A protein has these predicted regions:
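Single conserved hydrophobic/aromatic residue that forms the stacking wall/gate
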Residues: 1-12
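Short amphipathic coiled-coil heptad-repeat segments
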Residues: 13-19
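Cytosolic nucleotide-utilizing catalytic cores of signal-transduction proteins
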Residues: 22-264
């Protein structure tokens, strides 16, 4: 009986791999699942696990052993760096908490057992088998967008990509046009590292001058002077919400263009 269930698990696994690889027509997914008595409309999470600094074949086994129910949870090897986990969810379908916890466990397991670093992209929950491929693509986008805008994060959910996702979908020509319109007076390159650091800290502290000067260990007047200097250079007063938004988006657009040109 164990052999039979293992065999069935392998058949299901092949089916799932065909779905996420787009090797099966959407209409056939339901028919094939019905033949196999494979549940089509249970909520499933799709996690893409990408090994970053080095790769190890043992990662596949390590993750597979974490999810022993081979008829419900599937760990697939996509290429030498990428593994995918399709995990049936038990909690509410719209709760990201369960999926985040799974991702954290995987990251810890790979780090503790194999000394591997990874990034994990999470798609939105698949409520039907036929949308698995879309959710897998979302997990891929989460990693790609995260690589540009959230470099310090190792677990990235598609739901939390925010403006980054929007920028990522823009043609580079449009991005370049936007930058030249925003920085009419001087190009963004005119701002030195210290100035950019000040700006980022100011954004992190919600445009609060007192709080930012405290975090930067500078006098309030020094920060005000720096903000005035930025205003002179760019024409944007970062103390004004609308100007701050334009500047924040411009910084993200610049980051995106750098990544497209291979400059991280």
């Amino acid at each position: 009986d164990r052999l039979r269930s293992r065999g069935l698990g392998d058949v299901y696994k092949r089916q799932v791999k065909n779905i996420i690889s787009d090797n099966i027509l959407p209409g056939d997914i339901y028919v094939r699942a019905k033949e196999l008595h494979f549940a089509t409309d249970v909520p499933r999470a799709v996690l893409l696990i990408r090994q970053t600094e080095r790769t190890d074949m043992a990662a596949l086994e390590a993750i597979s052993n974490m999810f022993p129910d081979r008829q419900k949870d599937f760990v697939l090897s996509i290429n030498e760096t990428d593994l995918v986990l399709i995990k049936e969810l038990t909690g509410p379908a719209d709760s990201n908490k369960e999926v985040y916890e799974i991702a954290e466990e995987i990251e810890k397991k790979l780090h503790d057992d194999l000394n591997l670093k990874c990034v994990i992209g999470i798609g939105t929950t698949a409520k039907h088998l036929r949308v698995l491929a879309d959710k897998y693509k979302e997990a891929q986008v989460a990693i790609e967008v995260g690589k540009v805008f959230d470099t310090e994060k190792s677990i990235i959910h598609y739901d939390n990509l925010g403006i980054g996702r929007l920028i990522y979908q823009l043609p580079t020509t449009l991005c370049e046009m936007f930058l030249s319109e925003v920085f009419k007076k001087n190009p963004i390159e005119a701002l030195d590292q210290e100035t950019l650091y000040t700006i980022n800290k100011f954004f992190e502290n919600n445009l609060n001058v007192s709080e930012t000067s405290r975090k930067l260990f500078v006098h309030r007047n020094t920060l005000v002077y720096r903000l005035e200097k930025i205003k002179k250079l760019t024409g944007l007063d970062l103390r004004e919400f609308d100007h701050a938004i334009i500047f924040k988006v411009a910084l993200m657009v610049k980051k995106y263009l750098n990544s497209q040109n291979g400059e991280y």
